Each structure stands twice: as structure tokens, then as C-alpha cells.
UniProtKB/Swiss-Prot annotation:
This is Probable transcriptional regulatory protein XCC3027. GO terms for molecular function: DNA binding. GO terms for cellular component: cytosol. InterPro entries: Integrase-like_N, TACO1_YebC-like_2nd/3rd_dom, TACO1_YebC_N, Transcrip_reg_TACO1-like, Transcrip_reg_TACO1-like_dom3, YebC-like. It comes from Xanthomonas campestris pv. campestris (strain ATCC 33913 / DSM 3586 / NCPPB 528 / LMG 568 / P 25). Transmembrane segments: none annotated.
């Protein structure tokens, strides 16, 4: 009878996944610091990236080095932001955000993934209109729904969504009010379990059969690319299955 993965093998896989997450966060910290300066109190994007790093158990020393490299105090790599758009099989719209030090490599890798999985890249704006850019502050079950809602609306949030199945809460904001709402909620004693500025599809598309397999394969391939930070799609996640 065959043996399952060894403890060492599982640990190596876990370490590799953690390393990839750290790499993406460090790139986000670098770009945020270079664009808006190294002081998180005056740079909401940097503050958000730092919080993401700390919540992923990244050390403060690693974060500080990334900031110093970005601001020129230490030698470092310069990354640029690039966005690609396209379609997966079944007409599923996909947005791919990259932070890369080699634009030629990034576009080649993204194009290869689309092609290999039966999709195709589009031009700028070809699918972006199907998504809304917004801030999302997520609170786990157990948060005081009324208190969070009141504090969020007073701080300028656009909407508060409560999920009846588990009691989780999402506070939705415009991108330019995300930082102030997040700070106001923190001051009121409410720290989100997760906070980000993201894209959400206006309408989801359900897929099945071979199409679902190919869509899932494409999204996984894109997520695994070193230059890719985030992948957004309008696929109904439930239709992709396990």
C-alpha cells in the first residue's frame, strides 16, 4: 500500500506557500512605500500592507527592511504595477494584478496561462467594467452587529453586510474612505479579521463540467505566478466545486 506525504514533505509545501505569501506582501509594502513614503501614519496603503504582513506573522524587521529598500535607505529591487484583463472559458471575466521587476516576463507568463487553459487576454478595460472597486473590512462571527454597523456608518462606510448563516460581517467602503473607516472602527474597539481594497464582480457567472475544471485550473495557474499579486474573477465560486 502506498504511503501518504511525509511530515517533512508537508512542512516543505507549507513553508513554500508561506514564502510565496511573504514575497507578495513584501512587494506590496515596497510599492506602497515608494509611492507614498515610508511613514504608515501618512500612507494608508502602506499601513494596510503592513497590517497584512503582521497578520501573516511577518516579523517587524522584515517589514522595516522592505520599507527601507523602497525608500532608498537600503539597496533593493524596483517593482512596477501592471494589470492584465482577459476571459477564462465560459465567458468568465478575469483581472490579474501584478507587481513585477520584469514586465516582459510578467505578460508572457500571464498570456501563457490564459492560452494553456482555453482563455484569452483582452485589452485594457475589456472586463474591468464588470467589477466594482471597493474596500472590505471583514469581521468574524461574534462581533456586535449593531455596534459595528453604527460605528461603520458614522465613519462613512457605504454599506454593512451581515451573513445570517454564520454571523460574519463585511463593512463596505469606497476606496478613498477605506483608511478612515478602518481607523474609526479600530478606535471604537473593532479590529477586522481581514481588510483590503479589492474588486468585486457586479454579477457572477456559474460554470460546470469541463468549463469549471478549466476555469479553476486557470485561476490556480495565475495565482501561482511569481509576479501575480491578486486575481479577480466573476465566476460563481460555488460552481467551481472543491
Amino acid at each position: 500500500m502506498g504511503r501518504g506525504p511525509s511530515i517533512e514533505g508537508r512542512k516543505n509545501a507549507s513553508d513554500a506557500k508561506r514564502g510565496k505569501i511573504f514575497t507578495k506582501i513584501i512587494r506590496e509594502i515596497s510599492v506602497a512605500a515608494r509611492a507614498g513614503g515610508g511613514d504608515p501614519s501618512n500612507n494608508p496603503r502602506l499601513r494596510t500592507a503592513m497590517d497584512k504582513g503582521l497578520s501573516s506573522n511577518m516579523s517587524k524587521d522584515v517589514i522595516e527592511r522592505a520599507i527601507k529598500k523602497a525608500t532608498g535607505e537600503l539597496e533593493g529591487v524596483e517593482y512596477e504595477e501592471v494589470r492584465y484583463e482577459g476571459y477564462a472559458p465560459g465567458g468568465v471575466a478575469v483581472i490579474v494584478d501584478c507587481l513585477t521587476d520584469n514586465r516582459v516576463r510578467a505578460v508572457a507568463d500571464v498570456r501563457h496561462a490564459f492560452s494553456k487553459c482555453g482563455g484569452n487576454m483582452g485589452t485594457d478595460g475589456s472586463v474591468a467594467f464588470m467589477f466594482k472597486r471597493l474596500g472590505v473590512l471583514s469581521f468574524a462571527a461574534g462581533a456586535d452587529e449593531d455596534a459595528v454597523t453604527e460605528a461603520a456608518i458614522e465613519a462613512g462606510a457605504d454599506d454593512v453586510v451581515v451573513y445570517p448563516e454564520d454571523g460574519a460581517i463585511d463593512v463596505l467602503t469606497a476606496p478613498d474612505t477605506f483608511a478612515q473607516v478602518k481607523q474609526a472602527l479600530a478606535t471604537a474597539g473593532f479590529e477586522p479579521a481581514h481588510a483590503e481594497i479589492t474588486f468585486r464582480a457586479e454579477n457572477d457567472i456559474a460554470v460546470d463540467g469541463d468549463t469549471a475544471v478549466q476555469v479553476r485550473k486557470l485561476l490556480d495557474m495565475l495565482e501561482d505566478l511569481d509576479d501575480v499579486q491578486d486575481v479577480y474573477s466573476n465566476v460563481d465560486q460555488a460552481s467551481l466545486g472543491a
